[in-house]
A protein has these predicted regions:
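Helix C-cap/alpha-to-beta connector motif
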Residues: 1-11, 27-38, 65
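Conserved functional hotspot residues or short segments at active or partner-binding sites
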Residues: 58
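Phosphate-binding/switch loop-helix module in NTP-utilizing enzymes
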Residues: 61
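EAL-family c-di-GMP phosphodiesterase catalytic domain
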Residues: 10-19, 38-53, 65-176
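A short helix/loop element that forms part of the nucleotide-sugar donor recognition site in Leloir-type
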Residues: 22-26
Length: 176
C-alpha cells in the first residue's frame, strides 16, 4: 500500500500567492526525494478568488512536474461550477458539513437533503473524471452511505485522528 500513498498538503491562499511558491515546491520534491505524482496540493476555493488566471498558470507549472491537486472543502465557499470546468484538479473533497448528516434519519429535520446533495456532487465530479473524497467520516454508517453515493476516498476519525510524524510512522508500519 505504501507505493500508493499520497501526501496531501493544505496550501493557504497566502502561501500559494508567494512569488517563490513553485520553486519551494520543486525544492521540497528534490530534497525529500518523493515522486511528484505522490504530492497532492489541497487548495480551498478562497485560493481561486483573487486571480484565477495566475492560479491556473501556477497550477499548470506544477502539474508539468506531476503534482496533483484537490479542491478542498467543496461547497462551503464561493463554489462556482465555472471553477470546476477550468481547474486542473484531480480530487474534489466534499466538506464535512455535508457528510456529517448523511446518515441522519429522515425525520431529523435534515430529511434527504445531505444524501441528495452528496449524490449530485459525486455524479457531477465523476462526469468530470474527478475522484471524490468525503471529509469528516466518523462512523461505519456514514462510510457505507457515502460508498453507496459513489465516494472514492474517505477521511476522518473513523480511520485515524491526525497523527504526529512518529505516531504516523508506527501506524504505517502496522498497516504493512
Amino acid at each position: 500500500w505504501a507505493t500508493k500513498l499520497t501526501m496531501a498538503v493544505n496550501v493557504s491562499a497566502r502561501q500559494f500567492r508567494e512569488a517563490d511558491f513553485i520553486g519551494r515546491i520543486e525544492s521540497l520534491i528534490a530534497r525529500v526525494g518523493i515522486d511528484a505524482f505522490s504530492l497532492e496540493l489541497e487548495l480551498t476555493e478562497s485560493v481561486l478568488v483573487d486571480d484565477l488566471e495566475a492560479t491556473l498558470e501556477k497550477m499548470a507549472q506544477l502539474r508539468r512536474h506531476g503534482v496533483r491537486f484537490a479542491l478542498d472543502d467543496f461547497g462551503t465557499g464561493y463554489s462556482s461550477l465555472a471553477y470546476l470546468k477550468r481547474l486542473p484538479i484531480d480530487v474534489l473533497k466534499i466538506d464535512r458539513s455535508f457528510t456529517m448528516d448523511i446518515d441522519a434519519p429522515e425525520h431529523s429535520g435534515q430529511g434527504k437533503r445531505p444524501a441528495v446533495l452528496i449524490d449530485a456532487i459525486v455524479a457531477m465530479a465523476h462526469q468530470l473524471d474527478l475522484r471524490v473524497l468525503a471529509e469528516g467520516v466518523e462512523t461505519l454508517a456514514q462510510q457505507e452511505r457515502l460508498l453507496r453515493s459513489g465516494c472514492d476516498l474517505f477521511q476522518g476519525y473513523r480511520f485515524s485522528r491526525p497523527l504526529p510524524e512518529a505516531e504516523f510512522r508506527a501506524w504505517a508500519a502496522a498497516q504493512q
